[in-house]
Amino acid sequence: MSSIFSCVSHYKTLCFGNNQFVNVNELQQNLQRTFSFSDDFKCRRLDVGGKHCLFAYIDGNIDKILLEQDVVRPLKNCERLEKPYLQSLQNTVAYADEIEIVDIKDSPQSVASCDVAFFIEGEDNAYIFSLRKPAARAIGEPPTSSVMKGPREGFIEEIKTNMSLVRKRIKSPDLVVKTFEVGRYSSTTVALMYIRGVADEKIVERLSHKIERIDVDGIVDSAYVLSFIQTKKNSFFIQAGTTEKPDVASAKLLEGRIALIVDGSPIAITLPYLVFEDVQDGYDYYSGDWRASMIRMFRMFGALFTVLLPAVYISLQTYHFQLLPIKFLMTLMAATTNIPFPPAIEMLLVLTLFEVLNQASIRMPRYFGISLSVVGAIVLGDTAVKSGLISSPSVLVVALSAIGIFCVPDQVGAMSILRFLYLCISAVLGFVGVIILTIILVAYLSSLENFGTPYLAPYAPRISPDLQD
């Protein structure tokens, strides 16, 4: 498909220029010259009511049955095609409400966008029919967001379907949708959705301006758009929410956020993003207030546990062992006496091995990933401990840290980096280094803003009404 858009971009001015075509023969030659490198481009001649007409489309991207039954067949039976042509077509074909008029020199772009272009001899406009094939994937529960309670619908790779899933939940004329065509060759549709009167109009304007300024060859996923709209691109903390569930996107819209839906991607982007969204989950709203609050506290504790546990272990073992009870200290010394590596190097090796196994299990096929996890966790870990290369307390610490990291799955990358940073500074300065890095981290998070919204809101600064959720 990229070669098609390349042809359109290169030949559109050469073939069409600013002149109206003379007849259908000339138009067909120009179109065939424009798409000369694409074997799937098709032209079809048709006489309608005494007028010479032409269809142009990309084979494989349109529903030929709909084209034949609902467009071509009614036009063949049309006795007279008169001006205004749009009204005549609307009175003839079944897809009357989906006819769009474009200038003839812009018609190759519409054809490359998987639509059907219809030309009438002597007319300087093209009439566009949207007859794309229906989505190949049915709406179902997204694999990354399975739930025990709640809606199980998920976004798919078709933008119109995704927008309708949101509109099904927010039936209001104040739900605004702005569309953009992004990508020099791909011309990918990006939909910006927000609720008028709830979302901040300044953020909407700023985000719209960022999208309009995107200059790239193509957009094939929402992650491409995200890389252009981030306020701080070098931060390892995520700055935008992502979801595959229309109910989550709708809930965030009702809270005043903005959603971006990209054609071809099942993942919607929500902005502005706050760090405390990481501990929120749709299942919380099916629990009582106290229970949901406790669950979120456990998630926050799990995140802190993940980041700090290896650093605290190294600090206690290396610098502050006098803080440990005597029996615990003797047990720890007995387990680590014959290990050939210093504690910090040992912990670094175990953490690195875990990250390698984790990345390998993610990228391997599902069934092999399970086998790899068993081999890595049981065989390699047990063998390394029995051979005396690493100590059992180090394996236990890394295992506990690995469990806690998935309490905030959206921040797994940031948690992994912070865990290594805390480990390195604790190996040099002990608890003093942990405290210093914590102060720096809190100051850094306090300085972050996401489209003018503080990253630590509603706690810093404190916004009392927003604390209710």
Regions found by a protein language model. Give the residues of each.
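Positions that flank functional sites
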Residues: 185, 268, 372, 399, ...
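Transmembrane alpha-helical segments that form the functional core of multipass membrane systems
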Residues: 260, 273-414, 418-421
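Amphipathic alpha-helical protein-protein interaction surfaces
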Residues: 171, 337, 389, 430-431
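Membrane-embedded alpha-helical signal segments
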Residues: 1-308, 312, 323-326, 445-469
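Hydrophobic alpha-helical transmembrane segments of membrane transport and translocation systems
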Residues: 391-469
